[in-house]
Every structure is written in C-alpha cells, then in structure tokens.
Swiss-Prot record:
Cofactor(s) for this UniProt protein: [4Fe-4S] cluster
Identification of the protein by name: Lipoyl synthase 1
GO CC, one annotated term: cytoplasm
Top enzyme category: transferase
PANTHER family: LIPOYL SYNTHASE, LIPOYL SYNTHASE, MITOCHONDRIAL
The species this protein was found in: Nostoc sp. (strain PCC 7120 / SAG 25.82 / UTEX 2576)
Length: 291
C-alpha cells in the first residue's frame, strides 16, 4: 500500500520563514529531529518559528527499522558547546516553548542525561520564560539517569511508546514496552508536578483494540498527554506501511482518550510527538501544578 491518501497531503509553507529558521540552525550548527527524521510537518513548524532540537549528534546507537535517523555503533563524543548553542537558538527564535530530544546514546554511562541537564540550564539562563519539554530515550532503564534529568525541572517529560506490545520486536527491537511504562510511572513518582507525555504511531498492523489497550496502559501510569499519528515509510529500506488509518478513526481515539482522562490527546494522520507541542502552555494554565 504505497499511494498516500489525500488527507496526508501537506500545504506548501512560506519558504521565507522556513529559510530564516534553517539559517539560525545552520549558523549555530544544530540538528533538529524535524530534518533528521524527515518529519512531514517541518514546513508548518518552521513557518511558525518552532523546532525540536536533536542533541548529542545526528547519529543513533540503535537502528530501529521505522526511523530515518542515521545509525552509528560508536557516535562522536559529546560537544561541550552544544548546550550554549541550543540556548542561543531559543533566544534568537524567541521560543515560548522548546522541545529538546536526543538520539539514543547507549555508549554513554548515563545515556546522555547530563547533556540534557546542561541544555535545560542554558535555556533557563537566557530565556527563563520558555517552558521546556524533554523527549528522552529509555536510558536503558537507568533510573538514576532519569532522576538526574528530572532534577533539572523540565515542565514536560515525553517518552514515546511508539507501538503496541505485539509489534515491539519488529518495530522497536531494542526497546521494551514494560520499561517504557515504568519510565513514565517513575517520572510521575519522582516529580509529581511534572506533565508526562507519550506517543504512538499507527498503520503498522495494529488493531483498534490494541491501540485502546495501550491508551489504557498509559493512563494506568498517570500519563497526561498522548499523541497518535500515522506511520509513514521514510525510504524503501524502512518498514512498510501496513495501512493508512482514516481521520475518523483518529478522531475516535481522541474521544476515547479524553474519556480515559488524558489532559490532552492530539490524534490525527500528521500528528508527530512534538506537533503543536507549544499548546502545552495552555494546558498548564488550565491544569496548574505546584512544585
């Protein structure tokens, strides 16, 4: 099934604004998941002046068959100037909300937790009004590394579930479904004031019942925010799309998620984990939490 339906077509962006964002990113030698992972919303987000920064290099120590980020068994050493450069980009782009994510760095003892902390600190120093969302890997179950990140007090902790348990071995062979749930649960226990978030992609052969079960599992660990989007095959080398889920089904999942008690459900064919992430500021105003 290779022909994309009409609902997956994206509008052409205003390239002047996109060019301005790209110029800042190139000038500061920064990576974004928008570019590295070939996100279909790159034009819309860059046009709005937002980006999801990808730290710790453009290469990942895992080779998940759905992901378009490059694989390297031994990536380069961390760049000590990266946190400062990232913070400068936040300042130049005047971001109200920033998403900081990373490749998996299983080669590092703390999985890169210390680099997340440094990035958070630098952003706080130059743009204290900016809310910060970190989209983190599973840290190989290193819960002390998780605690280190949370002690830096990001407003949102995002860790993606990606798919249903039955498909984990094929889609996310180095991941673990139970570990993902435990990470989210521990995050809530360590930092009760935190907003937790997770996302799944569909179109890989899952059933409606299986998606609903994942949603129930996420609510059972008190996950606040859920994103659901259509998987799109980045290249012929990657996993094939099994089916294109209709907008009506995405809408039904949104309704179900709200019934389960998620504070926010973003569910549509083009939804990605950081899509419209800045809307969390309104959510924080509606559901305030004290540290």
């Amino acid at each position: 099934m290779t022909v994309k339906p009409d609902w997956l077509r994206v509008k052409a962006p205003q390239w002047e604004r996109v060019g301005n964002v790209k110029e800042i990113l190139r000038d500061l030698a920064l990576n974004t998941v928008c570019e590295e992972a070939s996100c279909p919303n790159i034009g819309e987000c860059f046009q709005a002046g937002t980006a999801t920064f990808l730290i710790m290099g453009p290469a990942c120590t895992r080779a998940c068959p759905y992901c378009d980020i490059d694989f390297e068994k031994k990536p380069k050493a961390l760049d000590p100037t990266e946190p400062t450069r990232l913070a400068e980009a936040v300042r130049r782009m005047r971001l109200n909300h920033v998403v900081i994510t990373s490749v998996n760095r299983d080669d590092l003892p703390d999985g890169g937790a210390s680099q997340f902390v440094k990035c958070i600190a630098e952003v706080r120093a130059v743009s204290p009004q900016t809310t910060i969302e970190v989209l983190i890997p599973d840290l190989c179950g290193n819960w002390e590394a998780l605690r280190i990140i949370l002690q830096a007090s990001p407003e949102v902790l995002n860790h993606n579930t990606e798919t249903i348990p039955r498909l984990y071995r094929r889609v996310r062979p180095q991941g673990n479904y139970d570990r993902t749930l435990e990470l989210l649960q521990r995050s809530r226990q360590i930092a009760p004031w935190l907003y937790t978030k997770s996302g799944i992609m569909v179109g890989l052969g899952e059933t409606n019942a299986e998606v609903r079960q994942v949603m129930q599992d996420l609510r059972a660990v008190d996950c606040d925010i859920l994103t659901i989007g259509q998987y799109l095959q980045p290249s012929q080398k990657h996993l094939q799309v099994n089916d294109f889920v209709t907008p009506e089904q995405f809408a039904a999942w949104q309704v179900y998620g709200e019934e389960l008690g998620f504070l926010q459900v973003v569910s549509s064919p083009l939804t990605r984990s950081s899509y419209h992430a800045e809307q969390v500021r309104q959510l924080m105003e509606r559901y305030p939490r004290n540290k």
